[in-house]
C-alpha cells in the first residue's frame, strides 16, 4: 500500500506545523512549505516523514514548480492544506 501524501503551506509554525507533525506521526508523507528554510530543516530533521520545500506563496510560478517537485518525489498528493 502506498503512503498518503499531504502538502502543507505555512508548515513551519503554528497550525501548519502542528498539522504536519500529526499527519507524519500517523505515517503520512508530509511536504511542508514556508519561506524560512531554517525552520523547515529543523522540522524535517525531527521527523523522517516530513520533507521541506522552501516557498514564498506570493510567487505563482514557484508554487507550480514546488507542486511539481512534490508530485515527482511522492508520485501523488492526496491533500493540499494552505495554512498561510
Task: Give residue spans per PLM region.
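Conserved glycine-rich cofactor-binding loop
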Residues: 10-14
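Aromatic pocket-lining residues of Rossmann-like dinucleotide-binding sites
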Residues: 23
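Conserved glycine-rich Rossmann-like NAD(P)H-binding loop of the short-chain dehydrogenase/reductase
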Residues: 26-43
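The beta1-alpha1 cofactor-binding region of Rossmann-like NAD(H)/NADP(H)-dependent oxidoreductases
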Residues: 55-66
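Conserved catalytic-site loops of classical short-chain dehydrogenases/reductases
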Residues: 78-79
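Conserved NAD(P)H cofactor-binding loop of Rossmann-fold oxidoreductase domains
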Residues: 83-84
Amino acid at each position: 500500500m502506498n503512503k498518503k501524501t499531504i502538502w502543507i503551506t505555512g508548515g513551519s509554525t503554528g497550525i501548519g506545523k502542528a498539522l504536519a507533525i500529526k499527519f507524519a506521526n500517523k505515517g503520512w508523507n508530509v511536504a511542508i512549505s514556508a519561506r524560512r528554510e531554517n525552520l523547515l530543516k529543523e522540522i524535517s530533521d525531527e521527523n523522517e516523514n516530513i520533507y521541506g520545500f522552501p516557498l514564498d506563496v506570493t510567487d505563482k510560478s514557484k508554487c507550480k514548480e514546488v507542486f511539481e517537485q512534490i508530485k515527482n518525489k511522492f508520485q501523488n498528493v492526496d491533500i493540499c492544506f494552505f495554512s498561510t
